[in-house]
């Protein structure tokens, strides 16, 4: 590893590409990487629609391999005016995230460093362990981009942190993201499509909450096989 080039932005870009290819291949082989990898064309399409701007804070509460934050960095860097102030804002006060799992946390931080984010603002913590009623204005973000885990089953003590109690991990994350979004902010979130059809009380309540609390722009139903792993 000591012999690898790591000086120029081109070197870092090549290394980051190799790193993400390795994560993707892990997912294709059915190993751990598939839990943390969202297809990059999908991420880029979501970011194009959201159009994050310099000065806005971008958040992912289920960071995984940090694909959303890395792609948002690339998007904003290419489009912003290159000056000292903007570069400082982009590096230090733009990208934020949380990740519970040890491997995912390490993978995400490393991916951000390889993309050029020198000191990632990623917390190693359980996002769902934080009561949403404690989220204040200072804790909110202009942009949220995420693909929270599907199919998890959360314990009752975790469910108590949310207004709508459900064991479905992704549905708790959705509540967290809504609460964490600034007024007038934008979010693009990948979530299982059963949120549209489940007839249990929690799913009905969550759909009602989304329609009443958010300005819902688009629902895009992806075909089978979109995700690896």
PLM regions with names:
Residues 1-54, 123-130, 221-225:
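Non-catalytic, mostly N-terminal accessory regions of nucleic-acid modification and defense proteins
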Residues 215-229:
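Class I S-adenosyl-L-methionine
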Residues 181-187:
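Short glycine-dipeptide loop
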Residues 33-146, 151-153, 158, 165-167, ...:
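Conserved S-adenosyl-L-methionine
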Residues 195-199, 228:
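Acceptor-substrate binding/catalytic loop of class I
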Residues 2, 211-212:
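Alpha-helix boundary recognition
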Residues 145, 188-190, 219-221:
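Short, conserved beta-strand edge motifs with alternating hydrophobic and charged residues
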């Amino acid at each position: 590893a000591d012999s690898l080039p790591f000086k120029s932005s081109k070197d870092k870009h090549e290394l980051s590409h190799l790193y993400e290819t390795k994560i993707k291949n892990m997912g294709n082989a059915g190993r751990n990487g598939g839990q943390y990898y969202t297809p990059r064309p999908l991420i880029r399409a979501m970011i194009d629609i959201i159009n994050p701007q310099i000065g806005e804070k971008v958040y992912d509460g289920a960071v995984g391999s940090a694909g959303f934050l890395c792609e948002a960095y690339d998007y904003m860097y290419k489009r912003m005016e290159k000056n000292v102030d903007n570069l400082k804002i982009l590096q230090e006060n733009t990208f934020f995230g949380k990740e519970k799992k040890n491997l995912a946390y390490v993978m995400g931080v490393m991916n951000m460093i390889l993309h050029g984010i020198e000191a990632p603002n990623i917390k190693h913590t359980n996002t769902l362990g934080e009561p949403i009623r404690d989220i204040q204005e200072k804790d909110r973000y202009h942009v949220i981009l995420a693909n929270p885990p599907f199919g998890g089953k959360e314990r009752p003590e975790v469910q108590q942190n949310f207004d709508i109690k459900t064991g479905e991990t992704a549905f708790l994350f959705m509540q967290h993201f809504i609460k964490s979004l600034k007024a007038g902010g934008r979010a693009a979130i990948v979530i299982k499509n059963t949120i549209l059809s489940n007839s249990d009380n929690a799913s009905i309540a969550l759909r009602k909450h989304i329609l009443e609390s958010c300005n819902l722009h688009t629902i895009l139903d992806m075909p089978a096989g979109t995700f690896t792993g």
